[in-house]
Amino acid sequence: MAQSGYGKILLFDDFAGPEIPVEQNLAYAAAGAAAPRIGPFKVTGDLAETDTGIINVDGKVNGWVRISGNNEDGKGVAIGTGTVFSPSLNGPIAIETRVEMAALTTRSIFIGFTDANADDVAEPQTATGTTMSPVASDYCGFVLDSQLTDSADWHAVFRGGDVTASTTSTDLDLDEDATAAESQVLRVEIDTNGTARWYVDGKLKSTQTGAISTTVVQAAIVGCWGTTTTAANLDIDYIAVEANRDWTV
């Protein structure tokens, strides 16, 4: 196949302007409405719900947006790509983001890759106490869930590769706490052979061979879902997605 100098794929947004205001979300969910986008990323989730949307955080330098999830368990919003990245054909693939939360309660956060990013995207994995429950068939990323016993820690979750992940949260705990009103840089890398790495603030926290299928096509997402009757949210400074172009197609 013919090739050119555009062999690297980089999707990036600093979120210095666009938003999908909560009070206008019904317009985006109406029949026949175009799928909402922010920069190079698509927006999925329960946009027809009352509390959901994506708003600018005015006065915060660099440009930030706030994902506003919903006040129902499992309802929320994600910013990400379509299912377009194959670890074996596009790898290494990576997603990096800088995030912050005003509080760590009443929310479930997923940052990483998943094979499921439908218009009404759900959490790739749910959690309660010390039990992780898979939802999507393939995923690899960070989870922070207020329903976990260790609700402030980031967890390294994965499914779909040669290795079966534990469903006990303590086995996946990175011992890296999120702190309310403090930002963190989170990065997930996946090699062509399915080996995954999790970084927090530039430090390698975990490596897992056979974490994810090498052939299943993935989407990169940053998502926030509610867990109770209190609306959830997540502030995002930037999202970067990196991959290599597959010249064989």
Mark where each language-model region is.
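Low-complexity, Ser/Thr/Pro/Gly-rich disordered linker/stalk regions
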Residues: 1-107, 244-249
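Short tryptophan-centered beta-strand motifs in secreted/extracellular beta-sheet-rich domains
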Residues: 15, 95-97, 181-191, 196-198
